[in-house]
A protein has these predicted regions:
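His/Asp/Glu-enriched, well-ordered alpha-helical/loop segment
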Residues: 246-253, 295-383
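N-terminal strand-loop-strand beta-hairpin
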Residues: 462-598, 645-669
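Alpha-helical scaffold segments that flank or form the walls of functional sites
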Residues: 81-147, 170-183, 437-439
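Active-site gating loops and adjacent loop-to-helix segments of metal-dependent hydrolytic enzymes
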Residues: 79-112, 149-168, 226-253, 273-276, ...
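Histidine-rich, glycine-flanked metal-binding segment
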Residues: 1-7, 14-65
Length: 669
């Protein structure tokens, strides 16, 4: 008896993307419920199913193929598209994306961004995407509402996130999310430790354990930039892939995004771990991250898919463009036009992509038993005409080298239509665009206000920030250090501790003097016995000092100083703050914390080495009231005499002002 089917597609060029690259030039596909029941020549399937098919669709000679699989993205970031471009990855991520996300990301933001992304992806023939973001359960809800298939990974990292104050909270969110969504017909829940550089070893181990416990994928970024790999070598003595292996990450079903900077041995490690890899050519090109060794990965037998990455670093979700770029880049970097031919490029975006996401049993090819995730592609438009039939691979080449996302006319996922004749059926495109425009206005206002203030940009980076401090201080120019060194041994002074370090300062100057000056400082702490550097500390200080008062002996009361840890490189801060000019200073500092008449003072003996300006003595103490300041100013004057420095030339300028007056700026931004 003839089997009943819901839909019979006929008159199609069927590209199955199965292991044999089977194709049918006059082909047909039969769908019942959520699955494919038959694929083959049109006449055979018409004879078998036409009589009892609820709907017969004449494809008009279009290509009928598996839906494309976006193997790595961050779909809610459609709402951040075009926000910050032409920046290095660290400046883009730490300087713009994360501050804006901390301010704006919410469940509502995530749902809107996801629906917007679903509309874009459906239009470009994507039926499955692999996501990593915050509030991932809301990504899952929106994707399911739109009818798309998705692997949704709840982000976990060491920093406070928009959806969690700690990594423990994120981990619990991931656990709850996985438990609620396991075995959903469209959504595969996952856990996503963001990257080795944003996660501790403990987090990597904990997320791997969670993924193993529920047998779900683990999605992460690995070896995206050379900087990441160099830092890993510097801190742990090994590259990224061996490091995460050591943490047990590969005991889980890993989906590794990027893998740009991996060698042959690391490729073997990924293969033996059965990890999937997402190649993201547009993002890697735009952020200048490098060229992933895709051909070597494929030759080794790795499952490598293709991803768009997030819309804020691409800036679109067009998988046709990604497939084409993947093929072109592979040819360029190998100097071989036969590298990554069209059938294999398309395979990466279909069956290999599904296998990389560990869902190859569900989707990725048109085969009986797999889900009905399929698309129709018109190859008759002007940009894809004429069509040749001479070579077996012509259809693949037409899609990869000349096809556009606008050629996709129809999309089905899990046996349900998401788009018919270019009309979206599950999302309201006009409403989404209007809502997105309103969000963009709010983000614009936030960034415009922030960009007007160096302090606001400093605060936006996150981390601790020590605000206004009041200091009583006095500074004198010395002929040499010996008198002070002898005086410090006197009975009137109680030395609590001493430190010796070299200070490397770079001061940023801005167009508007009211912005103050930003100092990037690296302190090299020196062991005087061994003569070696034992520790390095980096800090940012925003100096907008106002002189609140002046006492006897040129003792000053000053305020307005903001201090934050500097966790990024000098290059990062230069590109982030965009100073008009800068000056570099180097000095050798011996610092004592002392008690004088039951009052705490810092005594700095400084040798200005670059430029060479000789020796200076600074005496400083903090104060919190005018009366206290007057008392401490008097003691500071006494200390000048006790330290045999009262005859030195009094200096009321900061070091940068002395240098600024005597030396030219070292660079103009």
């Amino acid at each position: 008896m003839t089997q009943q089917v819901d839909t019979l597609f006929i008159n199609a060029l069927v590209l199955t993307m199965d292991e044999n690259f089977s194709q049918y030039h006059h082909g047909a596909v039969a769908v019942q419920g959520d699955s494919i029941v038959a694929v083959g020549p049109e006449e055979e399937l018409k004879q078998e199913y036409a009589a009892r098919a609820q709907e017969i669709i004449d494809c008009g000679g279009k290509i009928l193929m598996p839906g494309l699989i976006n193997a790595h993205t961050h779909v809610p970031m459609t709402l951040l598209r075009g926000l910050a471009d032409d920046l290095r990855l660290d400046v883009w991520l730490m300087g713009y994306m994360m501050p804006v996300e901390r301010e704006f990301v919410s469940p509502e933001f995530v749902r809107l961004g996801t629906l917007l992304a679903c509309a874009e992806q459906i239009r470009s023939g994507v039926t499955t995407f692999n996501d990593m973001y915050y509030f991932e359960e809301d990504v899952a809800k929106a994707a399911a509402d739109a009818g798309m298939r998705a692997v949704c990974g709840q982000t976990v990292m060491k920093f406070p996130a928009p959806d969690a104050a700690s990594y423990e909270d994120s981990l619990q969110m991931a656990r709850d999310f996985i438990q609620r969504w396991k075995d959903h017909p469209l959504i595969v829940p996952a856990v996503s430790p963001h990257a080795p550089y944003t996660c501790t070893a403990e987090i990597l181990r904990a997320t791997a354990d969670l993924a193993k416990e529920f047998d779900v994928p683990l999605h992460t970024h690995l070896a995206e930039t050379a900087f990441e790999v160099e830092n890993m070598r510097s801190e742990h003595g090994i590259p990224v892939i061996p490091y995460v292996k050591k943490q047990g990450l590969f005991e889980a079903k890993v989906i590794a995004a990027h893998c740009v900077h991996v060698d042959t041995g690391e490729i073997r490690t990924l293969l033996h771990a059965r990890a999937g890899v997402s190649h993201n050519p547009s993002s890697n090109l735009k952020l200048a991250s490098g060229f992933a060794p895709v051909v070597k990965m494929l030759e080794a037998g790795l499952n490598v898919g293709i991803g768009t990455d997030g819309p804020a670093s691409n800036n679109d979700l067009d998988m046709f463009e990604e497939v084409r770029l993947a093929a072109f880049v592979a040819k360029a970097v190998t100097n071989d036009p036969t590298s990554l031919p069209a059938p294999w490029a398309l395979l990466m975006a279909t069956r290999l992509g599904a296998q990389a996401l560990h869902i190859g049993h569900l989707t990725g090819s048109l085969e009986p038993g797999k889900r009905a995730d399929l698309i129709l592609v018109d190859i008759s438009p002007l940009h894809n005409s004429p069509s040749f039939k001479r070579a077996a691979d012509n259809a693949y080449a037409q899609i990869v080298y000349a096809g556009k996302s606008t050629d996709v006319s129809d999309v089905m996922v899990n046996g349900k239509w998401l788009m018919r004749e270019h009309q979206l059926l599950t999302v309201n495109e006009e409403e989404l665009l209007a809502q997105a425009a309103e969000v963009a206005k709010k983000i614009d206002s936030f960034l415009i206000e922030r960009e007007q203030s160096v302090l606001s940009k400093l605060i936006a980076l996150g981390g601790s920030l020590e605000q206004e401090s009041f200091e009583v201080q006095v500074k004198v120019k010395l002929a040499g250090p010996d008198p002070v060194l002898r005086a410090l041994k006197g009975p009137e002074i109680d030395i609590v501790r001493k430190r010796h370090y070299r200070e490397h300062d770079v001061y940023f100057f801005f167009d508007e003097p009211s912005q103050g000056r930003l100092r990037y400082r690296e302190d090299d702490f020196i062991d005087d016995v061994k003569g070696i550097v034992t520790n390095v500390r980096a800090r940012l200080t925003l100096l907008g000092q106002k002189r609140e008062g002046k006492f006897e002996d040129q003792v000053l009361l000053s305020r307005s100083r903001y201090i934050a840890p500097a966790s990024q490189s000098l290059r990062f801060y230069r590109e982030y703050f965009k100073p008009k000019s800068e000056i570099a200073i180097e000095k050798d500092r011996q610092r004592w914390l002392i008690h004088y008449k039951d009052t705490e003072f810092f005594v700095n003996l400084d040798q200005m080495r670059e430029p060479e300006l000789g020796y200076y003595l600074e005496i400083k103490t903090r104060t919190w009231s005018r009366k206290d300041a007057e008392h401490k100013a008097s003691l500071a004057s006494e200390l000048l005499s006790v330290l045999d420095a009262s005859s030195g030339e009094k200096v009321t300028e900061d070091y940068i002002d002395i240098v600024h007056r005597t030396a030219p700026r070292v660079s103009e931004a």
